[in-house]
Structures are given as structure tokens and as C-alpha cells.
Amino acid sequence: MSRIWLLVGLGGAVAASAVEQDDLLVSSPVIQLERPQALPTARPEDVGMSSQRLRRISTAMQRHIDSGRIQGAVTAVARRGKVVHFETHGLMDVDSHRAMEADAIFRMASSTKPILGVATLMLVEEGLLRPRDPVSKYIPEFKAMQVAVLNEPQDQDISPVRVNRRDPPAHRLVPANREITIHDLLTHTSGLASGGLGSAISKRPRRDSNATLATEVPKYAQYVLDFQPGSRWSYSPGVGLNVVARIVEIVSGTAFNHFVHDRIFEPLGMQDTHFNVPDHKTSRRVVIRNRSNWSRRPPTTFFSASGGLSSTAEDYLRFEQMLVGGGQLFGRQLLSPRTVRMLGSNHLGDLYRSFSRNQNGMGYGYTVAVVIDPIIAGSRRSAGAFGWGGAFGTQSWTDPVEQLAAVLMLQQPYSPAQYDFGNAVQQAIID
């Protein structure tokens, strides 16, 4: 069952004063969420969207819930600065049959990464670092990296895209042609811990229970690179962007968790976004089927920019709406419009591969995938739209052309549900 919420202060919904009752299936109870400032709301038709067509989001989510592929979801859409859709679907806890709630807290996994992208570009704007800076400028251990190549042929340096980690092929090491840069890490073109030959032959550093970015990131320099820096796109899921987070700490003089809280979460009113979910909020976490150990995890001191956050649909809608607004929300300018374009522009030509295949029509910016040609890419998003997702199924994106922000919160990575949500959002645009 899907529920459209009427919430005081927008805990994630469309305000009653802005929506005709006939347009809504209203559920109770009304939830009071304290927010520094509510996201504005509107009737979909007032911002060029169709109420009837937006209901297809609910139909699509329910279909995937009925199939057993997802347990539930929260979906949110804003256009032209106004929230037009915020809906809960399915169950927050399957075993207890607890319905999904508007303020449910989800594990964001790699949906954390665009937060780092914004944090880094804040320091670029302040002149404290440059994307083309070598990593060794801040962390000297990365000064002289090596690249793994196949042993044969001897007259060519070939770095395979993927290898069997348990039985890597015969290989040799060659010096990196140049140092890896912040740009390389933000675009996943560094070759650091990205699943190739170098990763297979490298010993993963052991992380202690009291590890921090400061203690762990220098150890990453022990990795052998998977390919020459800048020559390929290959996703570094858990290492590369943590290096950038450590640079943010060094340059700003502030721990990464405090930096993003003070500079991003607090100004945007993202009050439910945490590396460690506070005790009084743990009951709001989605109970993921077959992953009950999430609730038993001890607090961490390792604030991973690659995948450490938990958050809500409303909080991520605030983040995406800031990007739609050219770096501004509630009169608070986090980035300039030009810098937002830097974040969401393709920096790689045709290097982007989308994990397992060439992704024609797509590119990659700073921590986000970018639609270049939606027809060629088979994407329902507009040219210029950018965003990213997480391993548990979360997705969010910004569409500057349509002035649209969309958030899908899942805890099962099911691509048909992700596609159907994006399709339902785009087909609801009528002006």
C-alpha cells in the first residue's frame, strides 16, 4: 500500500493548503517534524506536472512490492522549487508488518558520494585546493605509485579491466606515468582500488575498530594501481573518495563528519543525515530483510565519504533541490551556479563505462553520472541531468533543464524499480 503524506513543516509531503483533496489519498496520522524551514509545496499542475501521471509512481512501486523484489520505498519529486510528490510505499519492517514511514532512515551507501563532491568543491571555491592538485601534495605517501600490467607481452603494458582475485594472471609492475590527482579520484579515473589487477595483487589494509580517515588513508598508498591514471573509468567503491575526504580534513582543519554537518547538513536542514544514527532515531531505520546486523553495528569513528551515511528522503530532496537551485536553498548559497555546473558536467569525454559496459550517451562529473544524450543512453532523464545511487537501491538526481529533483529510497537494489520510478517522474512532466 502507498501513502501520500500531509505533514506539518513538510516531513516529506505536499501541504494540504496547496493540494486539492481529490488529488490525494490522505492517510493518518499527521506527523510533526521540527525543521528550520519547510520545503515549499505546490499542486503538480502549477509547476507543469500531472497529478494523475504522478500516481503512476505508486502503481510502479506497488507492482515491485507485490513481486517481492522490494519491501518498500519512499519517493519524492520537486519541480521549479516546489515539492509535488512525497509518498511512502510498502513496509519498513517486513517481519513486524510495520508500514513505511515518511521519515524512515535508509542506509545511503554510495549515495554518500555526491555529498563529498559538494564538500570538495566548496574548498575549490575558497581557493584552498585545486582539482588537478596531486594527492601527494596533501598525503606524501601517494608520491610514487606503481601500476600492475600483464607479464606478457613485454613490449606492451596491458592492464586488464577485470581479473580473478583468487588467481591473478602473471604480472609485473611499472611506474605510474604521472601522479594521481584529486580530479582522478573524483571521476574514478585514478586506478586506485577499482577492481582490476592492481587491486587483486594488493594486500588490503586492516582497519582497526577505532580507525579514522587520518589513520587509514595513508595506508591506501600501498595499493598497486589498476591502470595508468586518467586512462580509464573504473569505479572505486570504497577507497578513492575516502582519500579526498581526508584531503578535505587536512585543508579545512576539520574532521570530515563535522565539515559536512556544519557546511552542508545544517544549512540545508538535513537533520536526519548521520554517519552514526543517534539512539533516539534508531527506531526509524528501515529493517532490511536478511541484514538485521545493521541495527547492531557499533558507532564508527571512520567517516566514509564513499558510503557511510544514513538519511531520509526529505533530507536528500533538500540536497538535490540545492543543486537544482544553482547551489542555493533558503537563501543560503553553498556553491555558485558555475561550480554546480562543474560538479554535474562530463569531465571524461567517452571514458565512462557504467561498470560492465560502454555507456554511450553518458558521462561522469565529480562524483555523479551525467546524461549527455538521453536517446543514445536509453535514459528517461534530460540531457544535463546528473546524480548517483547506492548499493541498497537509493537513487537521487538533479535535472537542471526541467528544474527537477527526484529521490528514490529503497533498501533492495532492484534496477527495474529504479527505472520505473525515473520513467514515471519524467512522463509526468506536461509543460
Annotate each PLM feature.
Residues 9-17:
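Hydrophobic h-region of N-terminal signal peptides that target proteins for export
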Residues 50, 113, 312:
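Short, conserved phosphate/pyrophosphate- and ester-handling motifs at nucleotide-, phospho-/glycolipid
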Residues 1-7:
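Short amphipathic, positively biased membrane-proximal segments
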Residues 67-69, 98-100, 130, 173-180, ...:
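Extracellular/periplasmic catalytic domains that process cell-envelope and extracellular macromolecules
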Residues 35, 41-108, 128-130, 144-152, ...:
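Short, conserved catalytic-motif segment at the N-terminal edge
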Residues 244, 395-397, 403-412:
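Short, well-ordered beta-strand elements
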Residues 24, 30-38, 93, 134-383:
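Short, surface-exposed loop or secondary-structure junction motifs
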Residues 55-62, 81-86, 106-135, 143, ...:
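Active-site SXXK
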